[in-house]
Every structure is written in C-alpha cells, then in structure tokens.
Curated annotation (Swiss-Prot):
Gene Ontology BP terms: DNA-templated transcription
Source organism per UniProt: Deinococcus geothermalis (strain DSM 11300 / CIP 105573 / AG-3a)
Name by which UniProt lists this protein: DNA-directed RNA polymerase subunit beta
CDD domains referenced in this protein's UniProt entry, alphabetically: RNA_pol_B_RPB2
GO molecular function, one term: DNA-directed RNA polymerase activity
Cited Pfam families: RNA_pol_Rpb2_1, RNA_pol_Rpb2_2, RNA_pol_Rpb2_3, RNA_pol_Rpb2_45, RNA_pol_Rpb2_6, RNA_pol_Rpb2_7
C-alpha cells in the first residue's frame, strides 16, 4: 500500500489525444491459442487452421502401400475437448499440467464391404492456456514465445560475380514442409537447385510439357537477340525429360517412370509434403501479380504435371536480370494486362518476415506426433485382422502425447515464465525470437538480421532487446502492434481524407504501408482535424520529407506506438540515448516487488494497463457492489441488470486472493484488497493489488529524494550511497520465498522414513518439528536447521546363514539408521510459511517411481536493502550500493530534509540519459505539491513547463520561510554568489531573493553537508526520482567455504556457489605470489588448500588440536598427470634427492 490510502491527485501532460486505447497486451498469445483450439465453434464450422488442419492433413489414413491392401481407410470426423480435471491453481499446488482430454470421432471404412465402424478415440491430454496467456506444465508456469522467421514465398536477391550483378530467385515453403528451391544464372544457363542438386530449369519445363519452340520463346521474351546456350535436353518429350530429371535428383535409383512421377509429385506437388502455406501463396501472388490458390509449386492432374507459379518466377527473374522496371503478368478479370513492378527483395523487411505464434507452433508439433501415430496405424492395418479392426484398436496416442511433452518441456520456444514482477510477466508473453527450431542460431546471425529496420516502426520495438549474444535476435512487440491471420505484424494508422485526419483506424502490414505517405502522431492539428501547418513532416518508405496536407494518406495513432510496453514506461524517453534506454527497459523487468509498493510520482500513463493485463492483480469482470472483503476473498453482489457470466453463484461473484505464493523467480506473489464494503465496481476495475501494484498502478520501485553530486568517493564508478532511513522505513524491503523438498524412497536396504525420531540429535535441534518430523509453519529457521526429519537405513554387510537363522528366531534387531534430513542450506533461512506433504495414493498426486512420499517446505525471507545490492532508475542509470549512511550524515536541504540517495554526476553526461534529470526536476515539483504526474512518451512535459512549476513551488516555499522569520543566512548567500560566478544563474549583486527564484528555475538547490553542517560549495540538483531494487541481490551471490566437496578425479575443490565450491587460485594469482617470493604461502595454496589429500587431512587435525600445521605431500593432480603420461606410453618416475625412485602411488593401487 502507499503511505496514504488515498489516491494522490494525478496531473496529466501531453497535447495529443489518442484515438484508440492500447489493445489487450496478451492478445498475441490468447487469440492465437483460441484460433488453434476453435473450441467455441461447432465442428462443421471450424476453419482449416490449427488443430483442425493437423487432423485434416493426417487423415484419411489409407494403408495401400507397395501393392498390398486390406481395403481399410481410417477417416476423421470431428474432435472435442473434455473438461480439465484440475484448475490451474490445483495444478501449481500438485505439480500437475493444466490440460484437457482430447477426443476425436474417427470412422473406419472397409472399402470392399462398405462397412463403417465409428468410434470416439482418446488422443491424449492437450495442455491448455490460462486466461493470462501462459501454460502450467508440471506445476510451473511456462510461456511459449512467438518466433519470427522468413516468410514462405518467392524472393529475388542479387550478388556480384566479378563485376557483373547476378540475380537469384528463391522459392521458400513453410518450415519443414518441403525443399528450398533456388534459380540462378550460371554461364547463361538458368539453373535450378533442389536439395543441393543442380540442373537446367529447361529440363523441368520440358516435364511440364514445354517444347523447343516454347522454351525459345520463353527465354528470348525480354531479349529477342539473345544467344541461347546449347540445350542438352533438346527434342526430349515430357517422359524422357522426367526420367533424366529423376537420374539427376536420385542418381542411385534405377529410372522408372512410375517411380519418377511418384518422386517429383512428393517433392513439389503433394499438398501433404510440399506446402507454401497461405502466407507463402499470398506473398507469391502479391509479388508476381497472380491470383492462384494452390499451395504447391507444381500441380498434377491426369498423369501430367502442371505449373503453379514456377514459369512466372522464371519470367520475373529474367526481367530483373535484363534491368526492366515492369513486367506483364497475365490479365485481370476485364482482360487488362497486369503490369507488375520488378524489384529486388529486402529479406529483413517485415513484409518478408512473419511471426509464428503459439497456435501455429503447437499445430506443427501436433502434426509431427500425428504423423508418427499414422505410421503406427498403417502398420497395424497391415499386420492385424482387418475384420476385427476398430478405430480404438488401431490408434495409439503415445506419439501425440510424447510430441506435446517434448514441445512444452524441451523446445527452445517454451520457456520458464519470468514472474519477477507483473511487467516481466507481460513482457515475456510479448517476446519475439528469431532463434529456435527452424530459426537462426546466435553464431550464424549476422549484423543485418539483428539491426533495426525502418519497417520495425510501430511493429517491433527498436529499443528493447537483450544486451550480449542475443542482441537483435530477441525483440519485443510494439505497444499497439497486432499479428494478423497470416502471421505478419500490423501497425495502426488513422486515415487522412483530403488533408483531414479522421478517427478511422486501419491496421497495415509493412509492405502495404510502403505505398503511403504517413504523418507523425505529433503533427499539429486544428480542432476540425485538418493539419495546422502548410507543410507536414511525413514519411514514405521510412524517408522523412515535407508534404502538402492533401498528399498525406495516413497518420500515426499515438507517439508511443513505436516502442514496446517496457520502453513506454520510461518518462522523458526522448531525452535518453538509445543504449541507456535499452538498459532501462530491460532493468524494469528485473525490479523486485517491494513490501511497500509506491507508484511513480512521474509516470507515463501506461502503468494502469500493465497491471490490468498482466494477470497478477484481481480485476473485476462484473458490475455490482462489494458486500464482503477480507484478506483471502472479495465478494461482489451483482446489480440487478448485470449479465450472469462465468463464476457467478446466485448473484454473488467471489474473487479468491492469492496470499504469499512463490513465483518462478522466488519473489512473493501476494494480493490485497483495495476496495471496501459498499464500493461500486465495474468490469475492468482493479479490486485487489497484486505484487508491485499500488491502487491499480504499476509500482516497481520507490519515489525517493536524490542528489546528483560527488560524495567523498563513495559513489565512484557507479557506486551508490544511500541513507539508512530507507532501510529503517522498509522502503526497499522485499519478501523472497524459497522452496525446498525432500523425497522418502524405497531403497534396496529398506524404506526411508519421514520422522521426528532422528538418532544423535538433541531436543533443541528438534524443537520446531511436529510429531511427523515436519517443521511447523511460523518457525524461524537458520542455515543448518532441520526442515524435515528423515532417516535411511545404513548399508550393512550381508548376514551369514547362521546370523539369518538367529534373526528369524529371535526377531529383527533394531537396524542402524542414519540421519538424511532436509536442512536449510548455507546462506538461506527465514520464516516457514507453508508445508505440503504428498503421499503415494493421494488423489491427483503423481510421484516419481520408487518415491513413497514427498514433503515441500516454503521458507520466506525478508530482505532489506544492503551494501552490494543493485539499484537502478528507469533511464539505465544503475549501480551497486556502496555505503549506507545514517540520515544525519547525508546531505540535507535548507528545511532539514535529508537526501535518501546520492548519484555520481559523472554518470550522466557521457551516457546521455538526460531523461533522469528532467524526471528529477518534475519529481521535485511532485514532492513539494504532493501530487503525481503523467508525462507520456514523446509527448512529455516541456522544460519550460517544469521550470515554471519549480518557480511557483519555490515562491510558495520562500514566502512560508519569510512568514516564519527565517531570513537568508550568510552561507546561503555565498553559495548563490558562487552559482553566479559559475554561470548557473545571473550574479545576484545583492538581490538574493531574485537569485533564489532563479536558482529554483534551474532545479538546483543549496545543499548542506550532514557531517559538518557547512553548505556544499555549489548548487546541487536535488529532486525525487523513481529508483528500483533489482533482482541481483548480494545475498544470493555472496558465498564462503572452509571445507566442502572435492572433484573426484583431481581432488580439487569444486567451483561455484551452487556446488558449495572454493575460490579458484588461478595462473595469474600464482604469478603474483611468485613475484613476491611468498614460497610457503604458494606451496600451501597448491597443496593443502587444494588437492593434497593426506596433507589437508593432517592440516585439519592440527588446526583442530591447536598444533602447528605440518608440511605437505604430493598433490593429487600431479598423480593424475603422471598417470596420463603413463597412458601415452611414457615411463615417468619421481626421484628423490639421492636419485632413488619414489613410489607416489604407494598404498593406492594393487601391486602388479
């Protein structure tokens, strides 16, 4: 909650009114999955996409193969989804997958007898998407991110052979749905490349029925005088050409006509194996000016192959090579010849790249699973008894289930959801990746693919992308962008009619946008919608120019349509350098939700939408009045005329709240109500704040008073100095929840037991365990404390027959057990908030084989801000807390207000992120007036407006000071004089009141050193800035070890915090000790502190007993080296001072 429960007054800047609101920010995911399932449509009305298309492609399954046939055909009628057995919440609790059973109605037709058997077959469980656009797989939230790839279709590109420019055509099908085909000129011959095999394209044209005369006419159409090279296939008929083509493509196989037809059909004409897809055919028709519907490159009818776009591609390529500007491609419905412009293609243009969303990726994966299932069906048809066959007996659903599991569990595009805060959650669903199956790889991707393209405008954010190896390959959807049915990204524009801007909004793909002149969103307009200026700055194909208003076709809908949601949350973005804005965008997603959420004093107006669309807060979906509120539920009674929808029982809708739940990243998901009994609520209203939400506005950090000044070197190199007041007031305190689990298994020695009865432990160690040995909720635990008591049987030698006899007579003696309890790991601890016990046989519990029961313990930790934590603002200014000073030692303002945080001024000019300075000045106005501001991206408050507000606030403050009798003292006058000398203000010349007002306009203040009480020599920028604590906390990174695990072979300590490893003393560190001649220290480092087994044991004993540490022996790694040299056949011996061999392996190995 905020410091006050009342909403502060929010004042909005910005001249531009937005004609359409932001679309639903998760619609890319939700709509795609809906289109994939089509669950709300009747079976006979379903479109041929998604799940339906996967079924339609695989069925009917006919086993007529290699001349054998039993006359069975398995055909598909319809599919339906059952009800999911568990809710998403139950699935998270029990480690289950949120899914629904998929049933298909199949019919088996006996062709001979005409008998039809119909059956409903269970095809496995299909994971379902939750309302917020994610999946719950094995209890964990996952997101399937969209993939961007080269759209199928035809592309014309150029390259230089020597000094001659040569053009190439490439025909690309849908991913994994056929071979890429390339056409290029080689010594005057147009060659075709399929599956790495080249042949003259004339050979394939002869197969399509072209004779010598037609070929000559085709190849000399644009250059009648051209000398055609010798054609080795001259005079061949289609069948001969087909056999010749078959020998080129399949050199090993004997050329037979039927085999050749079957091969070529499968390669380029079979819709099941070669598919341009709807986008591919659309792109091909657009490029070549045709209107074909076939999704293959060749057609096959009556035993003959026909053309479906190949000849047009050849003609276009020849026209391009000849340098023509247009080419005639057929005629339209009225018989008028269609002139198509001849241009090269830019493969990075967003008209040539498309997005594969969840639905398409899932359908592809299902197709793979169904293809495997169909193979199994064919085998069973051939091997089994045809009369006894039924659809249920023929179909095995295992391949489908395996394909789904593999996709969600192992695919590069199915990712563990980033739940650090609501923004990171939302951003993850809007991610677009060029990596993944069928995509690019980091190593292969060049600069061009990663670069910002002009068509990214309004579609893909030019700013938000990771730093490092994935830069430009992973990007984010712009705020208003949508993905259309064909997978192309569209941006919205307002239509301009005769120089007047209308409210009619049109969504356009990048290639359509290229045809128009588009004005910017900030072009000044008159009240009637006409442009206010005679010349309008607008762009065509990305080039800005001045146009007359009547020449403008469209106008941007909003200034923020160019950037993503993360970036649109940065106020004064237009004053920040892009590199720092990128860091600011990315770091907002790493902000940890704080205990006291406080929305920014200077926001951009997008904060509310992030909270409502991310799904982390509770949003009302009904109209009514709140009748009951507590920490776990809110009840809303519907108004009489409100529609009864969804989860309404009677006329009451109950909203369950999530309390202290662990997110994927270990942050705390907690919701608390912000409505009271009697409040009226409407659909879309936030009624309970989730993590990092304050009164329905996103609250990732805190509004704190900052100064930008050097501070005794404590803020050197981006280090940050903070006041202890922030820690005391819990401003940056966050709750983190760790999950620990332990399994009790059935072992060869006997079952493990979860119990309180653990040998060798005092009662004090067991005080927080209940009678079952599980820690009580509310207990405070420290590293080493027991969370769950468990005993396992010790391994013992096999008893002799006599012993076994005695045991059977006198009963089993108490067998030895060892303590294998779950303990708190080093560096962890906190308060136990929840324990869950799963036993085999419980409803809905699915334990691994051999596991009898599992106990899970959640421990919450309250983390205050400490030295070593990373903090950052929204403009990419980041640093590590270097010192926490008492508030009385921090610099303070003239009214005694101490500064909360000190940034280094050297971090601003070279990085050119001046947005933070403007935010600080406007934040200072917010602090003085107690209100909050909204300043939209690219439509922000002007510097002049901020100066005026600072002046008004300062005038009030000075008047108050005067009224209270506090005059300017001598020290303040000195600072003002100095400010005059520095040129910050005009020299005061005795008029200090005017100088104070002037200084206020600059946003600077007179600041005093808290330690000495003396004023700081020059004026300092002081104001309120929004600062976030990031997920990189020192507590997770700090690590120390005395003794611990060692590597098996080298016997050296392991590395890394996760392995409880040691610190590596590397080559350069050894050089440092050598340089100092510290021989004994060096020997210690290389022996007893590392891998001298006997030496380190002896040293440990000596330290425990308080004796002097004895010398070292031979390190283990030296023995490994000697053995490796032995394995090379080198006889290596170790000699002592008297040249006598020393057996370094004594006692280690059996004598030969």
């Amino acid at each position: 909650m905020s410091l006050t429960d009342q909403k502060p007054r929010i004042e909005r800047f910005g001249e531009i009114t937005e004609v359409i609101p932001l679309p639903n920010l998760t619609e890319v995911q939700v709509n795609s999955f809906k289109a994939f399932l089509q669950a709300d449509k009747a079976p006979d009305e379903r479109d041929d996409t998604g799940l339906q298309s996967a079924f339609r492609e695989v069925f009917p399954i006919d086993e007529t193969e290699k001349g054998r046939s039993t006359g069975l055909v398995l055909d598909f009628l319809e599919y339906r989804l059952g009800e999911p057995p568990y809710t998403p919440e139950e699935c998270r609790e029990k480690d289950l997958t949120y899914q629904a059973p998929l049933y298909a109605k199949l019919q088996l037709i006996h062709k001979d007898s005409g008998l039809i058997k119909e059956d409903q077959v269970f095809l496995g469980d299909l994971p379902l998407m939750t309302d917020d656009g994610s999946f719950v797989i094995n209890g964990a939230d996952r997101v399937v991110i969209s993939q961007i790839h080269r759209s199928p279709g035809v592309y014309f590109t150029s390259s230089y052979k020597g000094i001659k420019k040569m053009y190439t055509a490439a025909i690309i099908p849908m991913p994994k749905r056929g071979p890429w085909i390339e056409l290029e000129f080689n010594g005057g011959v147009l060659e075709m490349k399929v599956n790495k095999r080249k042949f003259p394209v004339s050979l394939l044209l002869r197969v399509l029925g072209y004779d010598d005369a037609q070929l000559k006419a085709l190849f000399t159409e644009f250059d009648p005088a051209a000398e055609l090279p010798e054609d080795k296939s001259a005079g061949m008929n289609p069948d001969e050409a087909l056999l010749r083509l078959f020998t080129v493509l399949r050199p090993g196989d004997p050329p037979k006509r039927d085999k050749a037809i079957q091969y070529l059909y499968g390669l380029l004409a079979d819709p099941k194996r070669y598919d341009l897809g709807e986008p591919g055919r659309f792109k091909m028709n657009t490029k070549l000016g045709t209107r074909r519907q076939d999704r293959t490159l060749l057609t096959f009818e009556d035993g003959r192959f026909g053309d479906a776009g190949l000849v047009d591609t050849i003609r276009y390529l020849m026209a391009l090579q000849q340098g023509l500007e247009t080419v005639t491609m057929g005629a339209d419905e009225d018989g008028v010849a269609i002139e198509v412009p001849v241009t090269e293609d830019d493969i990075d243009h967003l008209g040539n790249r498309r997005v594969r969303t969840v639905g398409e990726l899932l359908a592809d994966q299902l197709r793979v699973g169904m293809g495997r299932m169909a193979r199994g069906v064919r085998e069973r048809m051939l091997l089994g008894n045809p009369d006894a066959a039924t659809p249920t007996k023929l179909v095995n659903n295992r391949p489908i289930v395996a394909a789904m599991r593999e996709f969600f569990g192992r695919s590069q595009l199915s990712q563990f959801k980033d739940q650090t805060n609501p923004l990171s959650d939302l951003r993850h669903k809007r991610r677009i990746s060029a990596l993944g199956p069928g995509g690019l790889t980091r190593e292969r991707a060049g600069f061009d693919v990663r670069d910002v393209h002009r068509t990214h405008y309004g579609r893909i954010c030019p700013i938000e992308t990771p730093e490092g190896a994935n830069i430009g390959l992973i990007s984010s959807l712009s705020s208003y962008a949508k993905v259309n049915d064909l997978g192309f990204i569209e941006a919205p524009y307002r239509r301009v009619v005769d120089g007047r801007v209308t409210d009619d909004v049109v969504y356009m793909t990048a290639d359509i946008e290229d045809r128009y002149v588009i004005a910017q969103a900030n072009s000044p307009l008159n009240p009637d919608g006409t442009f206010a200026e005679e010349r309008v700055l607008a762009r065509k194909k990305g080039d800005p120019m001045l146009y007359a208003p009547t020449e403008v076709d469209f106008m941007d809908v909003s200034p923020k349509q160019i950037v993503s949601i993360n970036t649109s949350l940065i106020p004064f973005l237009e004053h920040d350098d892009a590199n720092r804005a990128l860091m600011g965008s990315n770091m907002q997603s790493q902000a940890v939700p704080l205990v006291r959420a406080d929305s920014p004093a200077v926001g951009t107006g997008v904060e509310e939408r992030v909270v409502t669309d991310s799904g982390t807060s509770v949003i009302s979906d009904v109209t009514g009045r709140v009748t009951y509120v507590d920490a776990r539920a809110i009840q809303v009674t519907l108004t009489e005329d409100a529609p009864q929808i969804g989860l309404v029982k009677g006329n009451v809708r109950t909203f369950e709240l999530v309390r202290f739940t662990r997110s994927n990243q270990g942050t705390n998901l907690d919701q608390h109500p912000i409505v009271s009994v009697g409040d009226e609520v409407v659909p879309g209203q936030v009624i309970a704040d989730g993590p990092a939400s304050d009164q329905g506005r996103l609250a990732l950090g805190q509004n704190i008073t900052i100064a930008i000044m050097p501070f005794d070197g404590f803020n050197f190199e981006d280090a940050i100095c903070i006041s202890e007041g922030l820690v005391r007031k819990d401003f940056y305190t966050s709750v983190h929840i760790e999950k620990d689990e332990i399994e009790a298994r059935d072992t060869k020695l006997g079952p493990e037991k979860i119990t309180r009865d653990i040998p060798g432990l005092s009662e004090a160690a067991l005080r927080d365990l209940d009678e079952d040995g599980i820690v009580r909720v509310g207990a405070e635990v420290k590293p080493g404390d027991i969370l769950v008591g468990k005993t396992s049987f010790k391994g013992e030698s096999e008893p002799t027959p006599e012993e076994r006899l005695l045991r059977s007579i006198f009963g089993e003696k108490a067998r030895e057990v060892k303590d294998t309890s779950l303990r708190v790991q080093s560096g962890q601890g906190g308060i136990v908030v929840k324990t869950v016990r799963f036993r085999r046989g419980d409803e809905g519990v699915d334990l691994k084989p051999g596991v009898r029961e599992m106990v899970r313990v959640y421990v919450a930790q309250k983390r205050q801000l400490q030295v070593g934590d990373k903090v950052a603002n929204r403009h990419g200014n980041k640093g590590v807390v270097s010192k926490i000073l008492p508030p009385e030692d921090m610099p303070y303002l003239e009214d005694g207000t101490p500064v909360d945080l000190v940034f280094n001024p050297l971090g601003v000019p070279s990085r050119m992120n001046l947005g933070q300075i403007l935010e600080t000045h406007l934040g200072e106005v917010a602090r003085l007036t107690g209100q909050k501001f909204v300043t939209p991206v690219f439509d922000s408050a002007t510097e002049e407006a901020i100066k005026e507000m600072l002046e008004v606030a300062a005038a009030e403050r000075l008047q108050r000071r005067k009224d209270e009798g506090f005059e300017l003292d001598k020290r303040e006058q000195e600072v003002l004089d100095r400010a005059g000398k520095l040129g910050v203000i005009s020299p005061p010349n005795g008029d200090y009141a005017a100088a104070q007002m002037q200084l206020a306009r600059t946003g600077k203040s007179v600041l005093y050193d808290g330690r000495t009480g003396e004023p700081i020599s020059g004026p300092v920028v002081v104001g309120t800035m929004y600062v976030m604590k990031l997920y990189h906390m020192v507590e997770d990174k700090l690590h120390a070890r005395s003794t611990g695990p060692y590597s098996l072979i080298t016997q050296q300590p392991l590395g890394g915090k996760a392995q409880f490893g040691g610190q590596r003393f590397g080559e350069m560190e050894v050089w440092a000790l050598e340089a100092y001649g510290a021989a004994h220290t060096l020997q210690e480092m290389l022996t007893i502190k590392s891998d001298d087994i006997d030496g380190r044991d002896a040293a440990y004993q000596s330290i425990v007993k308080g004796e002097e540490v004895s010398g070292s022996t031979i390190p283990e790694s030296f023995k490994v080296l000697v053995k490796e040299l032995h394995s090379l056949g080198l006889d290596v011996e170790v000699l002592d001072n008297n040249d006598k061999p020393v057996d370094i392996f004594e006692g280690m190995m059996p004598k030969r």
